[in-house]
Design a protein with these regions (language model features):
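Short, amphipathic alpha-helical interaction segments embedded in low-complexity terminal/linker regions
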Residues: 1-45
Length: 45
């Protein structure tokens, strides 16, 4: 099963303001749709 928690790398991207990169990395890893990925990344901000 795939973890829907953010990785340290993804959290660093969010902290650096690289939201598009974080969303892409999260989607590539989890296979979720864009809306779900964006909501997850936004929640981590």
């Amino acid at each position: 099963s795939t973890s829907l928690e953010l990785t340290d790398t993804e959290l660093r991207m969010v902290a650096d303001g690289r939201l598009v990169s974080a969303i892409k990395a999260y989607r590539d890893r989890t296979g979720v749709d864009l809306k779900t990925a964006k909501a997850t990344i936004d929640a981590a901000r």
